Regions:
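Active-site-facing substrate-recognition patch
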Residues: 1-27
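Alpha-helix termini
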Residues: 23-25, 49-58, 87-90, 119-125
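Short glycine-rich phosphate-binding loop at a beta-alpha junction
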Residues: 26-35
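A general structural motif
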Residues: 27-28, 93-97, 125-127
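Short, glycine/charge-rich flexible loops or terminal/linker lids adjacent to PRPP-binding catalytic cores
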Residues: 54-98, 106-116
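Structural beta-sheet core signal
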Residues: 65, 100, 130-132
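PRPP-dependent phosphoribosyltransferase catalytic core
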Residues: 116-202
Length: 202
């Protein structure tokens, strides 16, 4: 199954999620967005904290990013490669509150690696929160991962591989679109996009 998720839906859900975190008393010192997927939602959450803390004595929430990806090596082991941090975890101190933001928790390998890496620099697990728009619980897989999202907008229970869903985030994804999907989700709203998409090699 494939779902097209409009950016307005992600924006509104991100605002509600940020409000929930704030009402529960969680104000991060640092927000790390996972590029690319976490950027849009992270921007919204960052803006919420900037607005809600304006005029208070609370220090601003620092906004940063990490580029990381999971892959399967030649021995079929899941590995994670980190291409860079805009704010080095070496600067974190015990007691710092950290928020990781991503669009989806799917395999979970990348976020597990990143959270464990941050904990190796001092912050404790209770001071690190993971927020995602979509949290996929793949019951048919035996992953045995310790780090799962603390906050999410939607939770999907996937009991079998045939039940898997492909979520297309319209805020930043273009690859994998059929002619029918382009027509329905892009050209119907703005016919000028036909020319834009004509130079894209699928």
């Amino acid at each position: 199954m494939k779902e097209f998720l409009h950016y307005k839906t992600v924006r509104n859900n991100a605002l509600k999620l940020a409000y929930r975190m704030y009402k529960e008393g969680f104000i991060p010192d640092v927000i790390y967005v996972s590029l690319r997927g976490g950027a849009y939602m992270g921007n919204v959450i960052s803006e919420f904290y900037k607005a809600v803390l304006k005029g208070t004595s609370h220090k601003p929430v620092f906004y940063a990013a990490v580029v990381a990806r999971s892959y399967t090596d030649i021995k079929s082991h899941e590995s994670v490669a980190v291409d860079g941090w805009t704010y080095s975890p070496e600067n974190l101190r015990p007691g710092d509150k950290v928020l990781f933001v991503d669009d989806i928790y799917d395999s979970g390998y990348t976020i597990n690696f990143l959270v464990n890496y941050i904990m190796s620099k001092g912050p404790k697990r209770e001071d690190i929160k993971v927020a995602v728009h979509d949290y996929k619980v793949q019951e048919y897989l035996d992953k045995n991962l310790n780090i799962t999202p603390d906050y999410w907008c939607r939770k999907h229970i996937i009991k079998a591989q045939c039940d898997e869903i492909w979520i297309h985030y319209m805020s930043h994804e273009l690859i994998g679109l059929t002619d029918e999907e382009l027509e329905k989700y892009y050209f119907n709203d703005d016919p000028e996009l036909r020319e834009v998409f004509s130079v894209i090699r699928w």
